[in-house]
Amino acid sequence: MAPIQHPAFWSLLTQAAGTQALPDWATAERAITTHAVQAGGTVFLQGVQHPYVYAVQAGLFKLSYLQDDGTEWIKSFAEEGRFFASVSALQPGGRTAFMVTAIESATLERIDHGVLLALAERHLPWAKALYQLTLVYAARKEARERELLTLTPEGRYRAFLASHPNLALRIPQKDLARHLGLTPVGLNRIAMRVRRSVTSVSYTHLRAHET
């Protein structure tokens, strides 16, 4: 039976390793801590030393860049089953490049990156898991860059709805606008236009079946 003390990391790592068990899991269990975060609470700030990796048990988070003038740009969101870390902070002496805030009341699991590296050095399944998670992170980053550089604002909104239909319902519009590189007013106009086009297509499809 799979350990359930820290289900988020267990599921994440075993799936990444392609196995139902991981050697020396007890070492990871001892290093993982569970944290409850209230809506609006901060997981970590931008510009601090924080060499930890997180897995989301429950809830929703936003990962944001904060400019000197207070302007916030949201790089991504993390919901149940997702993981996150500031890669720059995982290097010796490194600091976080962004901050993380809870959109909903949530539960997180946290582990020191050094523990993961030590396990990967000793055990091939752990090395495979970390490699696969690195690929997942890189693929997300690549997709995000492609959308920002090649899609129109409406295209980015439609792509987000297609990729994250349920998540879109949980994210405040102001946060979604900051993620898509829009103003809330601009996003509202796009959302209304998209809804009208969907309604129009649905009506046309219905009429076609009636004739």
Give each language-model segment a name.
Residues 35-37, 78, 111:
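Hydrophobic residues at beta-strand termini and immediately following loops
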Residues 199-203:
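Short Lys/Arg-enriched helix C-cap and helix-to-coil transition segments
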Residues 204-211:
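Conserved small/polar residues in nucleotide/adenosyl-binding loops
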